[in-house]
């Protein structure tokens, strides 16, 4: 019995610590968003980084406390050394914040519209209008139609980076508010969510390690499938 136990112990495999082989990479926003570091992520192969999503609050990115409820998402699209580049792929707003804005005897009007920016990016935009008093159905319809028109017009006339800035920093919401308040008393406008569906011609080319260029491109293709 003792010999059998010794043999069993000798043949036992030791689990490999994969963390020791991992390297930490800094994730950077696109230059159009300041080129700032927004986080770190580990990987044992640069190709494994492609397609990873990094999240950061707009408050942390801009140092504006009033933007704490907005979360931005960036997808890694390239690697150079220990640095990973990324593309903005969308944003959302915390559910708690949106619920806190809804009051009794007010109407909530939602608009979901897909637009294409001046430089070819296709974006799905979700906007919300809260009226100051309860609105009738025909007022809701008129406001929703005008919301969609404003969003489409701004996207068509604006490059992607500027359009995203308008969504996140209030420019688009202010435009909707200014136009629609002439139709009915409003309380607030929120561009509460966006999603990039297609990248346009102005998308920044990812920077990749020369030695890993082919494998990184293959990983990117697999991610899109």
From Swiss-Prot:
Keyword field contains Ribonucleoprotein: yes
Similarity section: Belongs to the eukaryotic ribosomal protein eS1 family.
Pfam families reported for this sequence: Ribosomal_S3Ae (PF01015)
GO molecular function: structural constituent of ribosome
InterPro entries per record: Ribosomal_eS1 (IPR001593), Ribosomal_eS1_arc (IPR030838), Ribosomal_eS1_CS (IPR018281)
Protein name according to UniProt: Small ribosomal subunit protein eS1
GO terms (BP aspect): translation
Entries under SMART domains matching the protein: Ribosomal_S3Ae
Organism: Methanococcus maripaludis (strain DSM 14266 / JCM 13030 / NBRC 101832 / S2 / LL)
Domain of life: Archaea
Gene Ontology CC annotation, any one: ribonucleoprotein complex
Keywords: Ribonucleoprotein, Ribosomal protein
PROSITE patterns: RIBOSOMAL_S3AE (PS01191)
The keyword Ribonucleoprotein belongs to this UniProt entry's keyword annotation: yes
